[in-house]
Amino acid sequence: MSEYGATVAWHLPPQASFDYETFDRSHEWTFAGGEVVQASGSPEYFGTASRVNPDEAVIAATASCHMLTFLSIAAKKRLR
């Protein structure tokens, strides 16, 4: 069975506020192949809209799995 991992990194800059409404939710996901994704909380929870949020990532991962399964079946059946 395959193993997968990722590193999630966040830091609080010196002198930055750490209040619920204002702390920076920006962080990075780093994968084994070196890919880095700029992430944040969802905008509804004070995140940055221009970054990927965990809710979007779950949807994208699920859609990717479904697509790849469909394509694998189509390829095995030699459908074009």
Please name every model-derived segment.
Residues 1-60, 71-80:
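Extended beta-strand/beta-hairpin segments
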Residues 61-66:
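Mid-length scaffold segments of soluble, non-membrane domains
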